[in-house]
UniProtKB/Swiss-Prot annotation:
Protein's UniProt name: Putative thymidine phosphorylase
GO CC terms, sorted: cytosol
NCBIfam families xref list: ARCH_P_rylase, PRK04350.1
Gene Ontology biological process: pyrimidine nucleobase metabolic process; pyrimidine nucleoside metabolic process
Record key words, sorted: Glycosyltransferase, Transferase
């Protein structure tokens, strides 16, 4: 019997309190009785098995016996959770066989067009956590070079099919999605209660922030519970015609969540990958009609009208193939929408609009009404062109606020702290003039530096928008934080680049013309 054929020594599982994102990581002692240098090395892939249950992980080697002993196998939190066995359970560890679908990834890198079967195999292996982050990155980079229309359709279909697939016993199920990048912009939390109050079905699932100071789910969580199950979601929609929940908890298109976790650090955001991400989730969600908000601006994800047109054609192409009526609308992406950036501040804006507060941000109110109007006109009983008037009626009558409260009551109370950060700092204008530009990316960075979205009361409140006159020393915005170090970091970053451009009135007029 060769050493390779000998029975493998068993190791006891030990939980290591280490958050490794979405990647499965195992840790083994260099003195482990199961470690053979000719087989195992750092960052190799291993299969951990107990009877018929197994999980693949990336292996790290340690010399610290206090972390993992010679008779133990450490599992970081994600791997421990997925394996689902208690600490102390005996397991075997063996070299992992690379997924067959990696051959297709190599082919894509070399410029080959993949078949639908190959793309399906890749997505299936992704969702079974058979790929390391490096292997996922290889697939993303290969796909970023080029993707045919058939490959795009195959990717959308495969991603939609591996998670939860919702079906609704209603002829029209509307949805709205913004491609993101604009601070504030919490239109979904206003248009969902408007549309639901009208009687259309709008089961809205949203994401948490990844690189922004707040996602819709983070902001809604200030007001209500968002981590509901599929069964609870269906009950909420039956009672309210709509919901505002975190999509990650109902497991729509889990492959997309995995891909996004690797895309963002690599700054990969191609049109095809963006469309595949959005459309796979809408297909899985059972949407029949989709409105896509495309903000256009110099620091938005879409920089020009030409880019917006190309993206529109791609959304419509995929929608036509899968039987989803897709409408895109280009909106102003030159500056934030609303006055708040950060979960609590954005929730305050939303409730001010729904409550018809005279001080509510007019830009957020108007954009929400405009988007809601498009969705309402999917109702065949509503006269064409009457959507805006109906949306305004539902908002001004208080029906939308009442519907929002009903949604909040059905989703359950929030357990989040709603206080604003107690440490503040105002960023002021350096000269007299007119605000001519606002850098959305920089304001997002500053709000995150201040602690958002982890600290829901951290962020930025804006006092000035593009076109507003300012005097030297007048506040442009206020930073909110809880942690003194985060406040100081945000203030220092704002001194280097505050995100505002102030020009004299004549220069501003020339730019506008």
């Amino acid at each position: 019997m060769t050493s390779a054929d000998a029975p493998r020594p068993q190791l006891k599982i030990r939980l290591i309190h280490l958050d490794t994102g979405r990647e499965n990581v195992a840790v083994m002692s260099r003195r482990s009785k199961a470690l053979r240098p000719e087989v195992f090395s750092g960052f190799s892939r291993v299969e951990i098995r107990r009877n018929a249950k197994s999980v693949l992980a990336t292996l790290l080697i340690t010399d610290d016996d206090a972390l993992v002993g010679p008779d133990e196998l450490g599992l970081a939190e994600p791997a421990f959770r997925r394996f689902g066995e208690p600490a102390g359970t005996f397991v075997t560890v063996s070299p992992a066989t690379p997924p067959d679908s990696l051959d297709a990834v190599r082919g894509k890198i070399q410029g080959r067009t993949l078949s639908a079967a190959e793309i399906t195999a890749i997505v299936n292996d992704l969702t079974r956590y058979r790929y390391s982050d490096m292997e996922i990155a290889a697939f993303l980079i290969g796909a970023a070079r080029f993707m045919t229309s058939d490959e795009l359709l195959a990717l959308v279909s495969a991603m939609a099919s591996v998670g939860t697939q919702l079906r609704w016993d209603r002829p029209i199920v509307v949805d709205k999605h913004c491609i993101g990048g604009i601070p504030g912009n919490r239109t979904s939390m206003i248009l969902v209660p408007i549309v639901a109050a009208h009687g259309l079905t709008i089961p809205k699932t949203s994401s948490r922030a990844i690189t922004s100071p707040a996602g819709t789910a983070d902001t809604m969580e200030v007001l209500a519970r968002v981590d509901v199950s599929v069964a609870e979601m269906k009950e909420i929609v039956a009672a309210c015609n709509g919901c505002l929940i975190w999509g990650g908890h109902v497991n729509l298109s889990p492959a997309d969540d995995i891909l996004i976790s690797v895309e963002r650090p690599l700054c990969l955001d191609t049109r095809e990958q963006m469309v595949a991400s959005i459309m796979s989730k809408k297909l899985a969600a059972g949407s029949t009609h989709l409105l896509v908000d495309l903000p256009v601006g110099p620091t938005a994800k879409v920089a020009s009208a030409l880019d917006a047109m190309r993206l529109r054609k791609l959304f419509e192409f995929v929608g036509d193939h899968f039987g989803i009526a897709v409408e895109t609308i280009t909106t102003d992406g030159r500056q934030p929408i609303g006055n708040g950036i950060g979960p609590v501040l954005e929730a305050q804006d939303v409730m001010a609009v729904l409550g018809n507060d005279p001080k509510a941000p007019a830009d957020l109110r108007e954009k929400s009404l405009r988007l809601a109007a498009h969705l309402l006109e999917y109702d065949p009983h509503l006269r064409g062109g009457a959507g805006y008037a109906r949306a305004r009626e539902l908002l001004e009558s208080g029906a939308a606020l009442k519907q929002m409260q009903k949604i909040i009551d059905n989703q359950g109370p929030s357990t989040c702290h709603k206080d604003l950060g107690t440490l503040t700092a105002e960023v002021t204008a350096e000269r007299d003039g007119v605000v001519s530009a606002i850098d959305c990316l920089q304001l997002n960075r500053l709000a995150r530096t201040a602690g958002a979205p982890i600290d829901k009361g951290a962020g930025i409140r804006l006092f000035k928008k593009v076109g507003d006159r300012v005097e030297a020393g007048e506040p442009l915005y206020r930073i909110y934080a809880f942690d003194p170090a985060e406040r100081e970091l945000a203030v220092a970053a704002a001194k280097l680049a505050c995100g505002y451009t102030v020009d004299d009135a004549q220069t501003f007029r020339e730019q506008v013309m």
